[in-house]
Curated annotation (Swiss-Prot):
Cystine pairs: none
UniProt-listed PANTHER family: 39S RIBOSOMAL PROTEIN L20
Name of the featured protein: Large ribosomal subunit protein bL20
Pfam families (UniProt xref): Ribosomal_L20
Gene behind this protein: rplT
Family the entry assigns: Belongs to the bacterial ribosomal protein bL20 family.
UniProt keyword list: Ribonucleoprotein, Ribosomal protein, RNA-binding, rRNA-binding
Family annotation (CDD domains): Ribosomal_L20
SUPFAM superfamilies for this protein: Ribosomal protein L20
Transmembrane segments: none
General function of this protein: Binds directly to 23S ribosomal RNA and is necessary for the in vitro assembly process of the 50S ribosomal subunit. It is not involved in the protein synthesizing functions of that subunit.
Superkingdom as given in the UniProt entry: Bacteria
Length: 127
């Protein structure tokens, strides 16, 4: 079996790692071993944070919906429950968008949710 010389492939691989490590601080952008270590960590962080971003956005949408719902005298959980009872299928992303950019439409949805809720749920709780 012939001997394999890795020169071309190894240089190509190292060049690719160093290219993707551009912008890293200090030796991490210049030395191959340090760059590869940092690059592997950065790929791990990127993978993890792509998943974390989804829950962060959901939390943001819920906060925006709750704030706008309270301006319409209804809480977030009663709004969502009322929309389900009224068979209005709007996801949280769209609800948050309506709350920020089209408050009249959001208010109409709040009124529909209030109307769909049972009367005992609409009544304010006695202290």
């Amino acid at each position: 079996m012939a001997r394999v010389k890795r020169s071309v492939n190894a240089k190509k691989k190292r060049r690719a790692i160093l290219k993707s490590a551009k912008g890293y601080r200090g030796q991490r952008s210049r030395l191959y071993r340090k760059a590869k270590e940092q690059w592997l960590h950065s790929m791990t962080y990127a993978y993890r944070d792509r998943r974390a971003r989804k829950s962060e956005f959901r939390k943001l949408w819920i906060q925006r919906i709750n704030a706008a719902a309270r301006m319409n005298d209804i809480t977030y959980n009663r709004l969502i429950h009322g929309l389900r009872l009224a068979e209005i299928e709007v996801d949280r992303k769209i609800l948050a968008e309506l709350a920020v950019n089209d408050f009249e439409a959001f208010s109409a949805l709040c009124e529909a949710a209030k109307a769909a809720l049972p009367e005992d749920v609409n009544a304010p709780k006695a202290a």
